[in-house]
Design a protein with these regions (language model features):
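Phosphate-bearing ligand-interacting subdomains
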Residues: 1-18, 86-180
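Cytosolic regulatory domains of K+ homeostasis systems
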Residues: 2-83, 159-263
Length: 263
């Protein structure tokens, strides 16, 4: 079964961007969103103001708090205040995040990032525009609810756009049609930035900025000669894959990423 929570994925991406930006770069390449030459996505440290205390905002807060990053929430619905714990009341304020004076009062001038994650795209874009006027250097992040608004978000030059519906499609499609790639993505999250940085360099130097990812199942139908060789308990080295089928003098450019055994 494929169970996907887009808000958990988004918050995990933010966590990776904070702790290991080169793993974030590899993820974007594997999901065919960017190539490996894309600029490294660096998330600054400092005060983050999150507008919208819903499920997505709370998931993002968990990861920011884990990285010891100061967070302030702005929530427009005062009814939510009745449900807040004593701890939550320390970092959630109630008001209009699109109000210039209220943003200043909340600390927008000292913030390094503003995150608009309400369920209304017009509201999110308006909040970011107001914040950007007050603090031109601030990093902007937004939730895009409707794919039809994609042009508006790109025109607004939002630094990071998170679209739950698009993330769901990418994740499910990858898991169904590229299962080994999906496993590899889950594994690299546990690696560090130095490891990921070296892999990015190797891929770009040995192949190109956008290598093709190929999944091969070794069996009698797909790879008969390799299968027979292995079944006879003979050793087989990966370097054989570097030899071109068409000309023994030519070399294939490849880097093995993952080997999964059935047992």
């Amino acid at each position: 079964d494929i169970i996907v929570n887009p808000f958990s994925i988004i918050s995990s991406e933010i966590n990776i961007a904070l702790t290991a930006p080169n793993i974030f770069k590899l993820e974007k390449w594997l999901y065919k969103i960017d190539d490996l030459s894309a600029p490294l996505r660096i998330f600054p440290r400092g005060l983050y103001i999150i507008c919208g205390y819903g499920r997505m905002g709370q998931k993002i807060f968990e990861k920011l708090d884990k990285n010891n990053i100061e967070v302030k929430f702005i929530e427009i619905d005062p009814k939510r205040g009745r449900q807040l714990s004593k701890d939550e009341k320390n970092y959630v304020v109630f008001g209009d995040a699109d109000d210039r004076d209220f943003l200043i009062q909340t600390g927008i001038m000292d913030a390094v990032a503003v995150v608009a994650v309400t369920n209304d795209d017009t509201t999110n874009l308006s909040i970011l525009a107001t914040a950007k006027k007050l603090n031109p250097e601030i990093m902007t992040m937004a939730r895009e609810n409707d794919l039809a608004d994609d042009y508006l978000f790109k025109s607004a030059n939002v630094n990071h756009i998170f679209t739950p519906s698009k993330i769901l499609v990418n994740k499910v499609t990858n898991a169904l049609f590229n299962p080994l790639c999906d496993i590899f993505i889950k594994l690299i999250i546990n690696k560090d930035n130095e490891w990921a940085s070296q892999l990015v360099v190797d891929l770009m130097q040995d192949i190109n900025k956008n290598p093709l990812v190929v999944e091969v199942e070794i069996n009698l139908e797909n790879t008969p000669e390799i299968y027979k060789h292995l079944k006879s308990n003979e050793q087989l080295y990966l370097k054989i894959l570097a030899t071109s089928l068409y000309n023994r003098e030519d070399k294939n450019k490849f880097i093995p990423l993952l080997l999964q055994r059935k047992n």
